[in-house]
Amino acid sequence: MSQDYYQVLGVSKTASQADIKKAYLKLAKQYHPDTTNANDAEKKFKEINAAYDVLKDEQKRAAYDRFGHDAFQSQQARGGGNNGSFHPDINDIFGDFFSDFMGSGRRKQTSSKIRGSDLKYDLTIKLEEAFHGIEKNISFSSEVKCDTCHGTGSEKGETITTCDACGGVGATRIQQGFFTLEQTCHKCQGNGQIIKNPCKKCHGMGRYHKQRNLSINIPAGVENGTRIRHTGEGEAGIRGGNNGDLYVDIAIKPHDIYKVDGANLHCKLPISFVHAALGGEIEVPVIEGGKVKLTIPAGTQNGDQLRLRSKGMSKVRSTIRGDMLTHIHVEVPKNLSKKQRELLEEFKKESINEKENDSSFFNKMKSMWS
């Protein structure tokens, strides 16, 4: 079974792209075959690259968050993915790393845009809703883009100027002996821009707090614990930054009749001892609604399991369904009428005579006492 990509890189499912890249660079340096002789280095390096290849791409990541490794099975079957023996050059991997942390000899103008935070929402649904799929309306509060300044943070018609203290870089440099240190610009607070007349509604942030309503589509066959990612539905970014994402975690309520086992459903089916002995048909409820007939074989024993094929849960992106397994519970009556007792006494006599006439049974009993 493939390991979870987030676990491979050691990051959370809400990690930012910067966190994912940082974790990848650290692990790639540790396990690159050119830098270590560890026996499992090549295998680990392949896993790290496969995980990063998916998580660095927003579309691939969204598909992985929703469907897991199944989203890429067809690609792997065609030979896709980074499963060969090719190793990216160690210098290529860390080229950006060293330019980011050591400096490239010239200063780049930084952007004041900040990505919005991701949000998490816990949604509980019924088993029937998980089977059929459903559209749910959810309500939550978050930071939204200011509709007065359109996210600029400035009053309408006012201009935003480049910070004259740092030249729009967002940081100033201090020379200390042989070393040059950078610190956040005290004038623009690292934004690189100065808003002379901030928007009164959002106080210059380009966003404000608001209660939101959103329609969430739950696919048929969703499982308990599934996380659905809605790209761009998290908190609004600051000063034009990208929105964060919304993660909806699905929990399915325990059902009164069914227990879920993957795509299969289990239920306890009580039947009379007459049905168990003689057999017959009995109607049982099914998850899609209504009832179907189940054949009870004559001589069914307590604890027997009878299967109704394709009457279990639906599966995401599939027409195949699981099965429903009924666990037989034979009920013995506690109170009998006079006629019922007489009939059972007669049945008892017949049963004893049958056993005595059964030579194999009689011989077994005789051998025990001889």
Curated annotation (Swiss-Prot):
Residues that bind Zn(2+) 2, according to the entry? C163, C166, C185, C188
The record's InterPro entries line, in alphabetical order, gives:
DnaJ, DnaJ_C, DnaJ_domain, DnaJ_domain_CS, HSP40/DnaJ_pept-bd, HSP_DnaJ_Cys-rich_dom, HSP_DnaJ_Cys-rich_dom_sf, J_dom_sf
Which annotated residues bind Zn(2+) 1? C146, C149, C199, C202
Recorded GO cellular component terms are: cytoplasm
Q: How is the cofactor bound?
A: Binds 2 Zn(2+) ions per monomer.
Q: Give the CR-type zinc finger regions.
A: 133-211
- Where the CXXCXGXG motif repeats fall, as residue ranges, is 146-153, 163-170, 185-192, 199-206
Compartment annotation? Cytoplasm
Family the entry assigns: Belongs to the DnaJ family.
* Name of protein: Chaperone protein DnaJ
Q: Which organism is it from?
A: Rickettsia prowazekii (strain Madrid E)
Task: Name the gene that codes for it.
Answer: dnaJ
